[in-house]
Amino acid sequence: MADLLYIRVIYNKRRMKQSFNLFSKYQYLFFDLDGTVTDPMQGITRSVAYALNHFGIVVNDLRELCPFIGPPLKDSFIEFYQFTEVQAEEAVKKYRERYSETGLYENEVYPGMAELLEQARRKGYQLMMATSKPDVFAKLILKHFHLDGYFSFVGGSGLD
């Protein structure tokens, strides 16, 4: 079985060549999507604000919603806004209503990421995407930003 290494890439042109040398014994490189390949802040926080607005909650500073980035949405609505299970499920539906149409395209690819992925592929690495985001959204984001061709596998969560 091949050695696997899960890495969170922080792109730095000066260190890229040195970093690949550190990974030379590995065949597969696993990347997360949010916070590693793309910055999801605008799409996620605007979609959370949209969901909260449905409940009469207005958020003026989207940065207040950054804690929603990463953990499961339902849990975040319960933790940060004391929603009931039913309210949290409805909030997730409202979130996805906006996110599936607009929010997923509001991601920003980190500068230099496409070049890093291209160089890794040229060096013979198999690139994999492992994300907690629903894989249907992850695949759409990668395709939208023309990054889908770099990854031989994209794995994420289901919509439930």
What residue spans do the PLM features occupy?
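Asp-based, Mg2+/Mn2+-dependent phosphohydrolase catalytic module
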Residues: 3-7, 13-27, 63, 139-160
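Short, surface-exposed acidic
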Residues: 58-64, 84-93, 150
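Active-site neighborhood of HAD-like aspartate-dependent phosphohydrolases
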Residues: 17-67
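Helix-loop "lid/cap" segments that line or gate small-molecule binding pockets
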Residues: 51-52, 72-85, 141
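Metal-dependent phosphoesterase signature
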Residues: 78-115
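Substrate-recognition element of Asp-dependent hydrolases with the DxDx(T/V) motif
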Residues: 48, 116-142, 155-157
